[in-house]
Protein backbone atom coordinates (compact mmCIF):
# COMPACT_ATOMS: atom_id res chain seq x y z
CA UNK A 1 0.00 0.00 0.00
CA UNK A 2 1.26 3.48 -0.85
CA UNK A 3 2.27 5.56 2.13
CA UNK A 4 0.26 8.70 2.91
CA UNK A 5 2.43 11.78 2.54
CA UNK A 6 2.68 14.66 5.01
CA UNK A 7 3.61 17.87 3.21
CA UNK A 8 4.51 21.20 4.84
CA UNK A 9 3.73 24.18 2.61
CA UNK A 10 5.78 27.33 2.25
CA UNK A 11 3.57 30.17 0.99
CA UNK A 12 6.15 32.75 -0.06
CA UNK A 13 5.75 36.51 -0.58
CA UNK A 14 8.56 39.07 -0.84
CA UNK A 15 11.06 36.33 -0.13
CA UNK A 16 9.53 35.27 3.19
CA UNK A 17 7.23 32.47 4.23
CA UNK A 18 3.84 33.92 5.18
CA UNK A 19 0.57 32.58 6.56
CA UNK A 20 -2.87 34.10 6.59
CA UNK A 21 -6.53 33.26 7.06
CA UNK A 22 -8.77 32.76 4.03
CA UNK A 23 -5.88 33.94 1.81
CA UNK A 24 -5.63 37.39 3.49
CA UNK A 25 -4.11 39.04 6.61
CA UNK A 26 -0.70 37.52 5.94
CA UNK A 27 1.85 37.37 8.76
CA UNK A 28 5.53 36.48 8.58
CA UNK A 29 6.33 32.84 9.28
CA UNK A 30 10.05 32.66 8.65
CA UNK A 31 12.81 32.19 6.09
CA UNK A 32 11.87 29.62 3.42
CA UNK A 33 15.41 28.36 2.88
CA UNK A 34 15.93 27.71 6.59
CA UNK A 35 12.50 26.11 6.83
CA UNK A 36 13.20 23.81 3.90
CA UNK A 37 16.34 22.59 5.65
CA UNK A 38 14.48 22.08 8.92
CA UNK A 39 11.60 20.17 7.33
CA UNK A 40 14.02 17.96 5.44
CA UNK A 41 15.79 17.06 8.68
CA UNK A 42 12.43 16.54 10.42
CA UNK A 43 11.42 13.83 7.96
CA UNK A 44 8.72 15.54 5.89
CA UNK A 45 7.76 13.44 2.88
CA UNK A 46 7.63 16.36 0.47
CA UNK A 47 7.74 20.14 0.52
CA UNK A 48 5.51 22.56 -1.35
CA UNK A 49 6.85 26.04 -2.26
CA UNK A 50 4.22 28.45 -3.59
CA UNK A 51 5.03 32.00 -4.69
CA UNK A 52 1.57 33.27 -3.81
CA UNK A 53 1.84 36.73 -5.38
CA UNK A 54 3.51 35.87 -8.69
CA UNK A 55 0.33 35.62 -10.76
CA UNK A 56 -1.35 38.61 -9.13
CA UNK A 57 1.79 40.66 -9.78
CA UNK A 58 2.02 39.29 -13.34
CA UNK A 59 5.53 37.90 -12.99
CA UNK A 60 7.27 34.56 -12.93
CA UNK A 61 8.24 32.54 -9.89
CA UNK A 62 11.22 33.76 -7.86
CA UNK A 63 13.74 31.38 -9.44
CA UNK A 64 16.68 32.41 -7.27
CA UNK A 65 14.81 31.77 -4.05
CA UNK A 66 13.38 28.54 -5.47
CA UNK A 67 16.88 27.38 -6.37
CA UNK A 68 18.26 28.17 -2.92
CA UNK A 69 15.33 26.35 -1.33
CA UNK A 70 15.87 23.32 -3.56
CA UNK A 71 19.55 23.23 -2.61
CA UNK A 72 18.55 22.67 1.03
CA UNK A 73 15.83 20.17 0.25
CA UNK A 74 16.56 16.50 -0.41
CA UNK A 75 12.94 15.40 -0.35
CA UNK A 76 10.59 15.86 -3.33
CA UNK A 77 9.87 19.55 -3.91
CA UNK A 78 6.84 21.00 -5.68
CA UNK A 79 7.14 24.63 -6.81
CA UNK A 80 4.29 26.81 -8.05
CA UNK A 81 3.22 30.40 -8.51
CA UNK A 82 3.27 32.30 -11.79
CA UNK A 83 3.72 29.12 -13.85
CA UNK A 84 2.26 29.69 -17.31
CA UNK A 85 4.30 27.94 -20.01
CA UNK A 86 6.36 24.88 -20.86
CA UNK A 87 9.46 27.06 -20.49
CA UNK A 88 8.39 28.01 -16.96
CA UNK A 89 8.12 24.33 -16.10
CA UNK A 90 11.52 23.59 -17.63
CA UNK A 91 13.16 26.44 -15.71
CA UNK A 92 11.70 25.30 -12.39
CA UNK A 93 12.73 21.69 -12.98
CA UNK A 94 16.23 22.96 -13.74
CA UNK A 95 16.08 25.08 -10.57
CA UNK A 96 15.58 21.91 -8.56
CA UNK A 97 11.84 21.24 -8.49
CA UNK A 98 10.68 17.63 -8.73
CA UNK A 99 7.15 18.73 -9.59
CA UNK A 100 5.72 21.99 -10.90
CA UNK A 101 2.29 23.33 -10.05
CA UNK A 102 -0.04 25.22 -12.38
CA UNK A 103 -2.89 27.27 -10.92
CA UNK A 104 -4.38 30.33 -12.61
CA UNK A 105 -2.83 29.52 -16.00
CA UNK A 106 -4.53 26.11 -16.07
CA UNK A 107 -7.90 27.77 -15.52
CA UNK A 108 -7.27 30.26 -18.33
CA UNK A 109 -5.93 27.58 -20.68
CA UNK A 110 -6.23 23.93 -19.58
CA UNK A 111 -4.20 22.90 -22.63
CA UNK A 112 -1.09 24.34 -20.97
CA UNK A 113 -1.29 21.30 -18.70
CA UNK A 114 -1.37 19.00 -21.72
CA UNK A 115 1.63 20.72 -23.31
CA UNK A 116 3.68 20.43 -20.12
CA UNK A 117 2.66 16.82 -19.48
CA UNK A 118 3.51 15.86 -23.06
CA UNK A 119 6.95 17.41 -22.67
CA UNK A 120 7.93 16.33 -19.17
CA UNK A 121 5.45 13.61 -18.13
CA UNK A 122 2.37 13.69 -15.92
CA UNK A 123 4.39 12.59 -12.90
CA UNK A 124 5.82 16.09 -12.48
CA UNK A 125 2.74 18.17 -13.33
CA UNK A 126 0.49 19.30 -10.47
CA UNK A 127 -2.61 21.46 -10.79
CA UNK A 128 -3.47 23.54 -7.72
CA UNK A 129 -7.17 24.25 -7.25
CA UNK A 130 -8.28 26.99 -4.83
CA UNK A 131 -12.01 26.58 -4.21
CA UNK A 132 -14.75 28.25 -2.20
CA UNK A 133 -18.08 26.75 -1.19
CA UNK A 134 -20.93 28.32 -3.16
CA UNK A 135 -23.54 25.71 -2.22
CA UNK A 136 -22.96 23.41 0.77
CA UNK A 137 -23.85 19.74 0.33
CA UNK A 138 -27.42 18.84 1.30
CA UNK A 139 -27.49 15.02 1.44
CA UNK A 140 -31.17 14.84 2.41
CA UNK A 141 -32.03 16.59 -0.85
CA UNK A 142 -29.52 14.61 -2.83
CA UNK A 143 -27.49 17.77 -3.49
CA UNK A 144 -23.72 17.05 -3.56
CA UNK A 145 -22.90 20.75 -3.18
CA UNK A 146 -20.87 23.04 -5.40
CA UNK A 147 -17.44 24.63 -5.08
CA UNK A 148 -16.15 27.43 -7.29
CA UNK A 149 -12.55 27.99 -8.35
CA UNK A 150 -10.84 31.30 -7.58
CA UNK A 151 -7.59 32.39 -9.24
CA UNK A 152 -4.88 35.06 -8.85
CA UNK A 153 -4.15 34.13 -5.25
CA UNK A 154 -7.82 33.70 -4.44
CA UNK A 155 -8.75 37.17 -5.67
CA UNK A 156 -10.65 36.37 -8.87
CA UNK A 157 -13.87 34.29 -9.05
CA UNK A 158 -14.21 32.18 -12.18
CA UNK A 159 -17.65 30.57 -12.03
CA UNK A 160 -15.91 27.24 -12.74
CA UNK A 161 -16.94 24.13 -10.80
CA UNK A 162 -13.96 22.71 -8.92
CA UNK A 163 -14.88 19.04 -9.30
CA UNK A 164 -15.50 19.27 -13.04
CA UNK A 165 -12.31 21.25 -13.51
CA UNK A 166 -10.31 18.60 -11.66
CA UNK A 167 -11.61 16.01 -14.11
CA UNK A 168 -10.69 18.26 -17.04
CA UNK A 169 -7.08 18.86 -16.03
CA UNK A 170 -6.48 15.22 -15.16
CA UNK A 171 -7.73 14.30 -18.63
CA UNK A 172 -5.22 16.85 -19.97
CA UNK A 173 -2.38 15.13 -18.13
CA UNK A 174 -2.16 16.45 -14.56
CA UNK A 175 -0.60 13.80 -12.36
CA UNK A 176 -1.76 15.25 -9.05
CA UNK A 177 -4.28 17.74 -7.66
CA UNK A 178 -3.38 20.15 -4.85
CA UNK A 179 -6.81 21.03 -3.47
CA UNK A 180 -7.16 24.01 -1.13
CA UNK A 181 -10.38 25.04 0.56
CA UNK A 182 -10.31 28.83 0.72
CA UNK A 183 -13.11 28.74 3.30
CA UNK A 184 -10.89 26.74 5.65
CA UNK A 185 -7.46 28.19 4.85
CA UNK A 186 -5.73 29.26 8.06
CA UNK A 187 -8.83 28.72 10.20
CA UNK A 188 -7.54 25.57 11.96
CA UNK A 189 -11.11 24.21 11.71
CA UNK A 190 -10.16 21.13 9.67
CA UNK A 191 -10.25 20.28 5.98
CA UNK A 192 -13.38 20.84 3.90
CA UNK A 193 -14.10 17.11 3.86
CA UNK A 194 -17.06 17.13 1.42
CA UNK A 195 -14.95 19.05 -1.12
CA UNK A 196 -11.95 16.80 -0.59
CA UNK A 197 -14.05 13.66 -0.93
CA UNK A 198 -15.86 14.95 -4.03
CA UNK A 199 -12.61 15.64 -5.87
CA UNK A 200 -10.85 12.49 -4.62
CA UNK A 201 -13.75 10.37 -5.85
CA UNK A 202 -13.85 12.17 -9.21
CA UNK A 203 -10.25 11.70 -10.35
CA UNK A 204 -7.88 8.71 -10.60
CA UNK A 205 -4.76 10.63 -9.52
CA UNK A 206 -3.53 11.56 -6.03
CA UNK A 207 -5.28 14.47 -4.31
CA UNK A 208 -3.45 16.56 -1.70
CA UNK A 209 -5.85 17.98 0.90
CA UNK A 210 -5.04 21.54 1.94
CA UNK A 211 -6.58 24.28 4.03
CA UNK A 212 -7.67 24.26 7.65
CA UNK A 213 -5.46 21.90 9.64
CA UNK A 214 -5.43 22.78 13.32
CA UNK A 215 -5.04 19.38 15.01
CA UNK A 216 -3.46 16.04 14.23
CA UNK A 217 -6.93 14.50 14.00
CA UNK A 218 -7.61 16.81 11.06
CA UNK A 219 -4.75 15.14 9.17
CA UNK A 220 -6.29 11.74 9.82
CA UNK A 221 -9.74 12.92 8.71
CA UNK A 222 -8.35 14.21 5.42
CA UNK A 223 -7.42 10.64 4.56
CA UNK A 224 -10.11 8.56 6.25
CA UNK A 225 -13.06 10.84 5.44
CA UNK A 226 -11.74 13.00 2.61
CA UNK A 227 -10.05 10.22 0.66
CA UNK A 228 -6.87 12.26 0.15
CA UNK A 229 -3.58 10.61 -0.78
CA UNK A 230 -1.58 13.28 1.01
CA UNK A 231 -2.21 16.01 3.57
CA UNK A 232 -0.70 19.47 3.51
CA UNK A 233 -0.37 21.85 6.44
CA UNK A 234 1.39 25.10 7.20
CA UNK A 235 0.50 26.88 10.45
CA UNK A 236 0.73 23.87 12.75
CA UNK A 237 4.26 23.14 11.55
CA UNK A 238 5.60 26.67 10.96
CA UNK A 239 4.66 27.89 14.43
CA UNK A 240 5.70 24.73 16.26
CA UNK A 241 2.28 23.50 17.36
CA UNK A 242 3.23 20.00 16.21
CA UNK A 243 6.27 18.37 14.66
CA UNK A 244 6.38 16.23 11.53
CA UNK A 245 7.27 13.27 13.75
CA UNK A 246 4.25 13.81 15.99
CA UNK A 247 2.01 14.04 12.93
CA UNK A 248 3.34 10.80 11.50
CA UNK A 249 3.08 8.96 14.80
CA UNK A 250 -0.54 10.08 15.20
CA UNK A 251 -1.46 8.96 11.71
CA UNK A 252 0.26 5.62 12.16
CA UNK A 253 -1.63 5.10 15.42
CA UNK A 254 -4.85 5.73 13.48
CA UNK A 255 -3.93 2.93 11.09
CA UNK A 256 -2.82 5.13 8.20
CA UNK A 257 0.36 3.91 6.47
CA UNK A 258 3.08 6.57 6.69
CA UNK A 259 6.84 6.60 6.22
CA UNK A 260 8.34 6.57 9.70
CA UNK A 261 11.90 7.86 9.98
Curated annotation (Swiss-Prot):
Entry's localization field: Cytoplasm
Protein EC: 4.3.2.10
Active-site residues, as the UniProt record annotates them: 11, 130
Gene3D superfamilies: Aldolase class I (3.20.20.70)
GO molecular function: imidazoleglycerol-phosphate synthase activity; lyase activity
Any one biological process term the GO annotation gives: L-histidine biosynthetic process
Pfam families: His_biosynth (PF00977)
Pathway: Amino-acid biosynthesis; L-histidine biosynthesis; L-histidine from 5-phospho-alpha-D-ribose 1-diphosphate: step 5/9
Superkingdom in the source lineage: Bacteria
Xref: CDD domains: HisF (cd04731)
Predominant place of localization: cytoplasm
SUPFAM superfamilies in alphabetical order: Ribulose-phoshate binding barrel
NCBIfam families: hisF
Protein name as annotated: Imidazole glycerol phosphate synthase subunit HisF
Organism encoding this protein: Jannaschia sp. (strain CCS1)
